[in-house]
């Protein structure tokens, strides 16, 4: 039998305050968490939604070093940007604090000391990379090198961003310091470790036997770790940014960010509720839920629970809904490559359209596998679903009521069989949406809510009240009453998903408030109830708007290619005699035309100083024929003739290929006689 809880504590992964929030963060963590919290609030359940910025860790110190500022400067800037963006986007945290707060430093230090005094840590001396030039130990993100799996350059000591593989610094091929660029050496250092192997027995029972209902990706990743055997994990590291390890002999060492950050959920709760925070973290009648991305599964399902269990007074998570990753236009989202749709920029570019992004990210949520966000899909879902289905039905029902009944809810007369069938269809929506939300299937739940609008559109299309207005106003009133009840139900059903639109619709309907318990009823709007003026809930997004966003990404891709450009390696040496076999000359282009049925080919007539020759070249995508006529080009004159599209080509025009794939024909700087040799 499922346990009943008195209250629910919901946490969402703390975003790193070293950059803005992007759509991958939203789709993976914050939108689903917010949907669930809003759903519980509508049900009048006791729920607390905890958020905050993770402000320690190496990525922050690296950014500070690059920018020539302090780590505090970096986290201050991004904490406030992230917090403001979440507020504008409607992520309804009860508290959004930070891990540089005094409350957090005190609580995290006390947590460490409790475990230390209970003998829950082991001390180990190990060898770690050390930068002799900078005279500092190197944390994992301060070491880069070649990934041993995909062999891409620039992999970090904890993860390869290219293939996503988790790494240790010693896994890297040809490691180097991100501080000085020098090759690091191994040097001894002492740290404290949480012996996860000591907790393996109860973790195996708790996860593999007691929580088989967890999502397959969560359960599977945990099982994989447990089957491999858990190892002690360092809880301290050599850094000067973070919470100092609160024991003697720990100078120059701070709490490892994975140990420090999840305690932030607790300290943020304490900051909000200094007198009652323990109820939300220590009472067995409180349900604890962590919303995270798949890269955080192990920390929230194995490491943090082991910390809580070792402390002894905390509850453990009841569920850890974790999503897979969201990609962008077929490529992995990357902060370092600026390959992302940033939330603060979206809010500027699409004012008043928070719900469009919330809808699209939920409709395409990576709940069971990695999914892809494309701007074309964003536009299609807005125009074909939000505008054409939901918005269209609401507008028709409201405008027809305004036209025929002065925006007052008409009476419902005798019901036809079709009316009864329609009412029965939407009476079941509450149970269906609830069933899906209770098991964190947000994508399907939103689809079920949208189905209400489809029912409404079909009902209006089938009954055609505008045709009955001249002969049977009683029937028109019944049709519009049923339609308006559907509209009111839509406002409630979509409130967790599209809060801004539901609020707008609530005002149009002149309703004071929503309650989840009312969903599915057909008497939400009493007869004679005065409606307000109808407005469009959503508006079409034009092609030009989407093209601008796509162009922004193309510009980013081009900038990345420019920044990462490396010329191809030089080919093996050849003998001078081999080179002299090539007869490279300058010719003047007399004629140029496109080759029929060949997108890439141009046909040239070239004066080579001796005669006129024909050459076919694959540069049609890079030049128009008319811009080349009269120009001089370099070509190989003694290449054996070959037939291309039925045309005999008597040579090869030389071009240079740029890093973006574009071609530039090689031309002499000064005009020379046709047939001049290139030496």
From Swiss-Prot:
A Gene Ontology molecular function term of the record: ATP binding
InterPro entries tied to this protein: aa-tRNA-synth_I_CS, Anticodon_Met, Met-tRNA-synth_bsu_C, Met-tRNA_ligase_1, Met-tRNA_synth, Methionyl/Leucyl_tRNA_Synth, MetRS_core, MetRS_Zn
Chain ranges for the short sequence motif 'HIGH' region as given in the UniProt record: 15-25
Main location: cytoplasm
Family, per entry: Belongs to the class-I aminoacyl-tRNA synthetase family. MetG type 1 subfamily.
HAMAP family assigned to the protein according to its UniProt record, in alphabetical order: Met_tRNA_synth_type1
Annotated keywords: Aminoacyl-tRNA synthetase, ATP-binding, Cytoplasm, Ligase, Metal-binding, Nucleotide-binding, Protein biosynthesis, RNA-binding, tRNA-binding, Zinc
GO biological process, one term: methionyl-tRNA aminoacylation
Role description: Is required not only for elongation of protein synthesis but also for the initiation of all mRNA translation through initiator tRNA(fMet) aminoacylation.
Placement of sequence motif 'KMSKS' region: 332-336
Reactions listed under catalytic activity: tRNA(Met) + L-methionine + ATP = L-methionyl-tRNA(Met) + AMP + diphosphate
The UniProt record lists the keyword Aminoacyl-tRNA synthetase: yes
GO cellular component: cytosol
Cellular location(s): Cytoplasm
EC number: 6.1.1.10
Binding site for ATP: 335
Name of the molecule in the record: Methionine--tRNA ligase
Entries under CDD domains matching the protein: Anticodon_Ia_Met (cd07957), MetRS_core (cd00814), tRNA_bind_EcMetRS_like (cd02800)
Organism superkingdom: Bacteria
UniProt xrefs under Gene3D superfamilies: HUPs (3.40.50.620), Isoleucyl-tRNA Synthetase, Domain 1 (1.10.730.10), Methionyl-tRNA synthetase, Zn-domain (2.20.28.20), Nucleic acid-binding proteins (2.40.50.140)
């Amino acid at each position: 039998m499922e346990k009943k809880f008195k209250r629910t504590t919901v946490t969402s992964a703390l975003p790193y305050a070293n950059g803005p929030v992007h759509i991958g963060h939203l789709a993976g963590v914050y939108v689903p968490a917010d949907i669930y919290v809003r759903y519980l609030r509508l049900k009048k359940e006791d729920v607390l939604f905890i958020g905050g910025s993770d402000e320690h860790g190496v990525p922050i110190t690296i950014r500070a070093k690059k920018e020539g500022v302090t780590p505090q400067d970096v986290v201050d800037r991004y904490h406030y940007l992230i917090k403001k963006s979440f507020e504008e986007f409607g992520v309804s945290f009860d508290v959004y604090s930070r891990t540089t707060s005094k409350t957090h430093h005190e609580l995290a230090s006390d947590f460490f000391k409790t475990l230390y005094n209970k003998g829950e840590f082991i001390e180990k001396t190990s060898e770690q990379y050390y930068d002799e030039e900078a005279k500092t130990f190197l944390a994992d993100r301060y070491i880069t090198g070649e990934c041993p799996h995909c062999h891409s350059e620039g992999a970090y000591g904890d993860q390869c961003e290219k293939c996503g593989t988790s790494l240790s610094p010693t896994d890297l091929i040809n490691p180097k310091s991100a501080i000085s660029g020098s090759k690091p050496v191994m040097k001894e250092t002492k740290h404290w470790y949480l012996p996860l192997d000591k907790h393996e027995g109860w973790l195996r029972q708790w996860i593999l036997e007691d929580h088989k209902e967890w999502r397959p990706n969560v359960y599977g990743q945990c099982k994989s770790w447990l089957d491999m055997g858990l190892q002690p994990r360092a809880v301290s590291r050599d850094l000067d940014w973070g919470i100092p390890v609160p024991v003697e002999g720990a100078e120059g060492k701070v709490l490892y960010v994975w140990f420090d950050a999840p305690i932030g959920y607790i300290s943020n709760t304490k900051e909000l509720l200094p007198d009652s925070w323990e109820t939300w973290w220590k009472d067995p009648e409180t349900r604890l839920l962590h919303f995270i991305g798949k890269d955080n599964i192990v920390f929230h399902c194995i490491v943090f629970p082991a910390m809580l269990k070792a402390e002894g007074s905390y509850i453990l998570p009841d569920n850890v809904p974790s999503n897979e990753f969201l990609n962008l236009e077929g490529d992995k989202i990357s902060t370092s490559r600026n390959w992302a749709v940033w939330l603060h920029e979206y809010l500027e570019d699409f004012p008043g359209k928070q719900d469009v992004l919330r809808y699209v990210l939920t409709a395409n949520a990576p709940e069971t596998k990695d999914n892809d966000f494309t701007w074309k899909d964003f536009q299609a879902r807005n125009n074909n679903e939000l505008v054409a289905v939901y918005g269209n039905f609401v507008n028709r029902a409201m405008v027809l009521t305004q036209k025929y009944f002065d925006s007052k809810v008409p009476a419902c007369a005798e019901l036809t069989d079709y009316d009864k069938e329609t009412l029965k269809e939407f009476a079941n929506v509450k149970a269906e949406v609830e069933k899906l939300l209770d098991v964190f299937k947000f994508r399907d739940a939103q689809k079920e809510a949208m189905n209400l609008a489809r029912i409404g559109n079909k009902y209006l299309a089938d009954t055609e009240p505008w045709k009955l207005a001249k002969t049977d106003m009683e029937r028109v009133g019944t049709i519009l009453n049923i339609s308006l009840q559907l509209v009111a139900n839509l406002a409630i059903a979509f409130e967790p998903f599209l809060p801004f639109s539901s609020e707008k619709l609530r005002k149009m309907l002149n309703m004071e408030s929503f309650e989840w318990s009312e969903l599915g009823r057909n008497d939400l709007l009493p007869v004679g109830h005065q409606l307000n003026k109808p407005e469009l809930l959503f508006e079409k997004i034009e092609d030009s708007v989407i093209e601008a966003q796509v162009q922004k990404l193309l510009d980013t891709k081009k900038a990345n290619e420019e920044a990462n450009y490396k010329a191809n390696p030089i080919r093996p040496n050849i003998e001078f005699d081999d080179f002299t076999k090539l007869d490279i000359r300058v010719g003047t282009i007399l004629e140029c035309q496109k080759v029929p049925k060949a997108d890439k080919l141009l046909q040239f007539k070239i004066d080579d100083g001796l005669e006129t020759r024909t050459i076919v070249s694959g540069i049609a995508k890079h030049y128009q024929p008319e811009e080349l006529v009269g120009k001089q080009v370099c070509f190989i004159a003694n290449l054996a003739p070959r037939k291309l599209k039925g045309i005999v080509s008597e040579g090869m025009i030389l071009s240079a290929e740029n890093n973006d794939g574009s071609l530039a024909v090689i031309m002499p700087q000064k005009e020379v006689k046709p047939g001049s040799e290139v030496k």
